[in-house]
């Protein structure tokens, strides 16, 4: 696999959410709606703290 899944903590509400590190679309927090990832053509621009990385198998 060309990327990993990560767990990101929202900077506004501290909700933890899992997403693909190379997200192709904007990812918003499921609780407060704050944008936590923006696509850049490669790895996404992450807003918030990455708390865990799930390694590829």
Swiss-Prot record:
Binds 1 zinc ion per subunit. The keyword Electron transport does not apply. Keywords: Metal-binding, Ribonucleoprotein, Ribosomal protein, Zinc, Zinc-finger. A zinc finger (C4-type) spans 10-32. Its cofactor is Zn(2+). GO terms for cellular component: ribonucleoprotein complex; ribosome. One of its GO terms (biological process) is translation. It comes from the Archaea. GO terms for molecular function: structural constituent of ribosome; zinc ion binding. InterPro entries: Ribosomal_eS27, Ribosomal_eS27_Zn-bd_dom_sf, Ribosomal_zn-bd. Zn(2+) binds at residues 10, 13, 29, 32. Belongs to the eukaryotic ribosomal protein eS27 family. Part of the 30S ribosomal subunit. This is Small ribosomal subunit protein eS27. The lineage of its organism: Archaea, Methanobacteriati, Methanobacteriota, Stenosarchaea group, Halobacteria.
